[in-house]
Amino acid sequence: MRAGSREARLVAALHVPAALSLLGIVRPGDRLVAFADDFADAFACGFDACDVVMVGGPSVAAFAAASEGFDASFDAEGPHLWWFVNSIGGFGLRVPDLRALGRAARVTHALLVVDNTVASIFGCDPLRLGAVLSLEALDRVCAGDAPRKLVAASVARSQLKRHRVDAAAECAHALLEGRGLASLDLSSDEVKVLEHGLDSLGARMQAHFDRARALAEYLAANEMVRSVRYPELTSHPDHAIATGILEHGFGPAVEFDLMDCSAGEFFSMLPDEFRTSPAGGATTRLSAPRGKRASTIRLFAGTDDPLVVAATLDTALRN
């Protein structure tokens, strides 16, 4: 929980869109505008009575265009307009300008929700930047050891300087309070995992970030890799934005395209642990965000030795 949040709740859910649905604050008659092109299927259920609009980019212009004609309100009765982005996410690991989106959302009477899972509370503070609600799947916080999938939801403070009130944040708080949700009952094992994870979070996340940076630099220099997306690289479309949005580095994820083989073929040449290790754990993990027949790989750096990881990847790339 960030010091700047008004309250935080835990939800048992597979991922952030599922948690947002379970919170019940996006209601029938609302419009939900989302940029999550690598996770669009997650919005296909759970928001059936809402007008869900998927946009092709994280820009203010895209969200504003998708919001036209909707008469939104910050009153508890609604209807409400929701804007959903990831602090790092989408194909290409995009980094939206959360400050600009936060300002534009308030002008449009929209409620900005940020999935902060990839960056984590260590790497980004969406509430400080303009979001009214920040949600984060806790796989990495729990170091991959949680008995079940948990998502934390933090609500922004509505009291601003000079006794001003942020109507958007107050609306989000009122909606959540109105649901009257009971606190999630955690087992003793879950409490221990969370406490240990939070105690060690800073050091572990810095290790994830540092290793991602090293692996991104290795991949960018590898002749067997077609292209690399990592927010620190100047070739990334959001590099300039990311320097002012992200903290302690540029996140734990790197995306790259293979030159001469598919993701499925590449995985077959690697040890199984790259695919089967727990999400958020110490072992570097790979996925195929566009499917195994495509050539795109997404890498989440663990805390393992990046030289060993790079050597293993290099062997597979050259086979």
Give the location of each predicted region:
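N-terminal glycine-rich, Lys/His-bearing helix-loop that initiates the first secondary-structure elements
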Residues: 1, 294, 315
